[in-house]
């Protein structure tokens, strides 16, 4: 619904212009959830770096909810970070570089790692929201497709660990 509010604001300020949406990674989940209900609002959609369906999402949700019984939902958890955030680094352990999975160019990853705006971890609520988006994205429930001619571009790397590819 947040994306729909943004859509309404943008269309009010820029009436008559085509409206495209781009979602990357977690944002790709959000735009696909948006698409279920508001496909008529869009003139085009670009979906990039799409996380694949994760059959462990219900178990992850249960773990996060269990952790929230003892911690504030807006607090961080090393356990949750080690399970969720670090799972993409595991195939790249030999490179001895955190976030090596984001790019094959080591210098790009080093620059990313030094940027304080890039080095954050989710709160428990953030992980729960991510898992909710994943479940909603891959659920067959709730689709009200009305814009059958909507152009949609999906872009992902063949070895993207988010998509389930092997590095």
Task: Kindly give the residue locations of the regions a language model identified.
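Alpha/beta-hydrolase fold nucleophile elbow
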Residues: 14-25
């Amino acid at each position: 619904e947040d994306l729909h509010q943004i859509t309404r604001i943008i269309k009010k300020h820029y009436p008559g212009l085509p409206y495209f949406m781009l979602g990357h990674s977690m944002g790709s989940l959000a735009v696909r959830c948006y698409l279920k209900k508001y496909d008529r609002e869009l003139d085009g959609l670009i979906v990039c770096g799409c996380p694949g369906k994760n059959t462990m999402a219900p178990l992850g949700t249960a773990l996060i909810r269990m952790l929230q019984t003892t911690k504030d939902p807006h607090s961080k958890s090393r356990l949750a970070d080690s399970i969720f955030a670090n799972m993409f680094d595991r195939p790249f352990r030999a490179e001895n570089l955190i976030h090596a999975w984001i790019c094959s160019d080591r210098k790009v990853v080093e620059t990313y790692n030094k940027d304080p705006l890039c080095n954050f971890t989710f709160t428990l609520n953030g992980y729960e929201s991510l898992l909710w988006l994943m479940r909603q994205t891959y659920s067959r429930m709730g689709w009200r497709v009305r814009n059958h001619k909507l152009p949609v571009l999906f872009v992902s790397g063949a070895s993207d660990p988010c998509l389930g590819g092997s590095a």
